[in-house]
Amino acid sequence: MEEEEHEVYGGEIPEVGDTDVPDPDIDMSAADEDAVTELAEMKRRLKEMEEEAAALREMQAKVEKEMGATQDPASMAANQEGKEEVDARSVYVGNVDYACTPEEVQLHFQTCGTVNRVTILMDKFGQPKGFAYVEFVEVEAVQEALQLNESELHGRQLKVSPKRTNVPGMKQYHPGRFNPSMGYRFRRPFVPPYFYSPYGYGKAPRFRRPMRYMPYQ
C-alpha cells in the first residue's frame, strides 16, 4: 500500500524577524492631534448653529410681539381717537382742478388759519382724483374754511365740507330722507312686459293631441 503525500506548506517558511509587529517606538501623538482638532471644529460649528437658531427665535418673538401690539384693542382705540382728533381739524375739498397743486390749495385756505397739511388724493396711475383734504392746526379754522364753500380756484367752484371719520369695519349708509317740498315717491308695482303672442291677444295656444299610430286591419 502506497503512502499518500500531503503538502503542508507550499512556500518558504518565514523567519522570525520578517513578521509585521507594531513598533512600540512609533509616535501616535500626530493622529491624536488630528482627532482633537476635528472634534474642536465640530464643536465650533455646533455652537454657531445654536447661536443662529437662538437669533431666529428672538427675531420671531419680536415680530410676534409687534403683530400683537398692532392688534391690541387699546392701541387701536388710541389710534382711532387720534384720527378723530385730526379729522376734527380738517375739511374735505371737492371739485379741485386736476392741475391744482397742494401749494395753491394752501394759499387758498391760509386766511382761515394755519394750514398743517394738504393732501390731494391720487389714483393708481398717479393722476389726481379731483378732491383734497386740508388739515389745520386750530379747530376753529374749520368753520372759517366752510365759508369758502363754492369759492373759485382755477375757475372751478370748490365744495368744502367737514371731513368725516371712517370707523373701521363699518360702512356708512345714508338713507334717503323725506322731503315735504318734493313729496314722497312711491315705488310703482312691477308690471311684466307685454308679451306678443302669435295666437292673438288674450288667446291661449291650442295644442293638438299627438296622432296615434293605427295599423291597417
Swiss-Prot record:
Residues 1-28 are annotated as: Disordered. The keyword Coiled coil applies. Keywords: Coiled coil, Cytoplasm, Nucleus, RNA-binding. The keyword Coiled coil applies. Residues 89-165 form the RRM domain. It is found in: Nucleus speckle; Cytoplasm. Transmembrane segments: none annotated. A motif (Nuclear localization signal) lies at residues 162-169. One of its GO terms (cellular component) is plant-type vacuole. One of its GO terms (molecular function) is poly(A) binding. Residues 15-28 have a biased composition (Acidic residues). Residues 30-71 form a coiled coil. Residues 75-216 are annotated as: Necessary for homooligomerization. Monomer and homooligomer. Binds RNA as a monomer and oligomerizes when bound to poly(A). Forms a complex with cleavage and polyadenylation specificity factor (CPSF) subunits PAPS4, PABN1, PABN2, CSTF50 and FIPS5. Interacts with CSP3. Involved in the 3'-end formation of mRNA precursors (pre-mRNA) by the addition of a poly(A) tail of 200-250 nt to the upstream cleavage product. Stimulates poly(A) polymerase (PAPOLA) conferring processivity on the poly(A) tail elongation reaction and also controls the poly(A) tail length. Increases the affinity of poly(A) polymerase for RNA. Binds to poly(A) and to poly(G) with high affinity. May protect the poly(A) tail from degradation. The RRM domain is essential for the recognition of specific adenine bases in the poly(A) tail, but not sufficient for poly(A) binding. This is Polyadenylate-binding protein 3. It comes from Arabidopsis thaliana. The lineage of its organism: Eukaryota, Viridiplantae, Streptophyta, Embryophyta, Tracheophyta.
